[in-house]
């Protein structure tokens, strides 16, 4: 059996399409969104509404609290467990979302790399103990791409990446990128013409503000410190800076729109790496044709 991943840039219009398709075929959704995973962060992450979630069961949405640590490795474990449970019940799991690291975790897994070297590990631990932050700086120097992927305080993965580098002379990010994509998955990428996508992003940000995003951020700041990883999410970090009087509300909204457009562009660049992905331009075909095309791909053996 082949499983279907449906991805695309933020604001492309995945949610309502997938709700309709899932309702028709009796599927359940496993989210591929690293921000919708947080509880209490609803408006700024564009979570499916309660009504939409009642129509179709969603998994890995509202999964953890904003101050809890989670990464792509944990996601893969949770997603594979859910996939197995749903398949066993005869339910089609649809993987839906635009977080590239989660898609990679699902279709590639994780590079195991060179065997452990206790001498290197002891030396690295000694360096970190002597001067905290040293290993993070080393990783940023030797493998900046991987440093961006992991949490700054994830010492286990930092040490592993440096260990692989010193053992093999190769970056763990490069070795991971060479990992073959599993043939168990079909990837569909939804896209739109650039100007239309950017207009949709701008409109959605305006709707988020009207829906109460400012109040949502204010309430979250009463519960959690401003520097947690979850608050690096676009829409939250800009409004936190607004509350700190770094700029006015008009500037904050402008930055949310701009940063979201930049994010959408990065998502599209990432998705182009999947050479066998099937691209569907929603600007060029009707909704009915889109639904029929996606259903056909899902049903193909």
Swiss-Prot record:
GO function terms (MF aspect) = ATP binding; tRNA dimethylallyltransferase activity
What cofactor does its activity depend on?
Mg(2+)
Q: A Pfam family name for this chain?
A: IPPT
UniProt cross-references to SUPFAM superfamilies, sorted A to Z:
P-loop containing nucleoside triphosphate hydrolases (SSF52540)
* Keyword annotations of the record: ATP-binding, Magnesium, Nucleotide-binding, Transferase, tRNA processing
Enzyme class (EC, first level) = transferase
Q: What does this protein do?
A: Catalyzes the transfer of a dimethylallyl group onto the adenine at position 37 in tRNAs that read codons beginning with uridine, leading to the formation of N6-(dimethylallyl)adenosine (i(6)A).
Q: Which HAMAP family match?
A: IPP_trans
Q: PANTHER family in the record, alphabetically? A: TRNA DIMETHYLALLYLTRANSFERASE
Q: What is this protein called?
A: tRNA dimethylallyltransferase
């Amino acid at each position: 059996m082949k499983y279907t991943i449906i991805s695309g840039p933020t604001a492309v219009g995945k949610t309502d399409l997938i709700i309709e398709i899932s309702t028709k075929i009796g599927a359940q959704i496993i989210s591929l969104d690293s921000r919708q995973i947080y509880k209490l962060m609803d408006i700024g992450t564009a979570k499916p509404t309660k009504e939409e979630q009642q129509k179709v069961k969603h998994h890995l949405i509202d999964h953890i609290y904003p101050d809890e640590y989670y990464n792509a490795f944990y996601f893969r474990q949770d997603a594979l467990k859910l996939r197995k449970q749903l398949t066993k019940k005869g339910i089609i799991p649809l993987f839906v979302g635009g977080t590239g690291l989660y898609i990679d975790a699902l279709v590639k897994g994780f590079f195991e790399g060179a065997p452990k070297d206790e001498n290197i590990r002891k030396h690295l631990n000694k360096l970190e103990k002597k001067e905290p932050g040293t290993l993070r700086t080393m990783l940023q120097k030797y493998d900046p791409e991987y440093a961006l992927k992991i949490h700054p305080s994830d010492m286990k993965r930092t040490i592993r990446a440096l260990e692989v580098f010193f053992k093999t002379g190769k970056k763990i990010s490069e070795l991971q990128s060479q990992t073959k994509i599993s043939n168990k998955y079909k990837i569909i990428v939804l896209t739109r013409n650039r100007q239309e996508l950017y207009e949709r992003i701008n409109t959605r940000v305006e709707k988020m503000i009207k829906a109460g995003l400012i109040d949502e951020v204010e309430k979250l700041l009463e519960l959690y410190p401003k520097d947690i990883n979850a608050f690096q999410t676009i829409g939250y970090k800009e409004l936190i800076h607004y509350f700190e009087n770094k700029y006015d509300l008009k500037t904050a909204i402008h930055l949310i729109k701009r940063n979201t457009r930049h994010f959408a562009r990065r998502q599209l660049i990432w998705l182009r790496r999947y050479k066998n992905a099937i691209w569907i331009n929603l600007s060029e075909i009707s909704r009915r044709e889109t639904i029929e095309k996606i259903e056909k791909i899902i049903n193909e053996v």
